[in-house]
Amino acid sequence: AALTLAKTGLKPLIFERGADVDSRQKAVDKFFNGGDLDTNSNVQFGEGGAGTFSDGKLTTRLNDELMADIIEIFVEAGAPEEIRYLQKPHIGTDKPRVIVKNIREKIIALGGKVFFNAQITDIECRNSTVEAVIINGEQRVETDSLFLAIGHSARDTYEMLMNRGIEMESKAFAIGVRIEHPQEFIDKSQYGVDFNKIDKMAIDFDFFNIIFPYLS
């Protein structure tokens, strides 16, 4: 959203409660190696959100008219060009951090500003219209337009919004699970009992039909 606004000539201000991606990497390494948790800069909070430390798989919504534009933004920021046409686009495990940084630099080059370690701790409204935001409990920034992209883990922000009487509506969510099966189980279910007598390729689990008798 900030990049789109910047491209139109506006100068968006972005307040990120966590650190920039490089500082965030150091904080994450400290946690993984020694258990030192920075509550505002970790695998959830910080530049790029949780996706910064994902495996790089893109969940595309083919019927979304904006998807092509989003893919193009990724490519311009350093993602592989093949994600334009792959059925299951993947930008690589280490690429998200590079892409996030490049998008930020593009926003700044277009006139936007990015502030890190800057949590919105309060919102001032009058007559159901936002007038200002408070950063880190101290700095007041006037605005009449505000986008909140806080993910699902900023519970303190949701509590603040609720206390301010701002209407919110929950959205549907999905919970993923990891299922592991022996390779023999998969091959037998897909190719039959003589699976070891034929040449076979790896099966994409999305297209794997579980044969219930084999579960017993």
Predicted regions, residues:
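Residues forming the flavin
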Residues: A2-S216
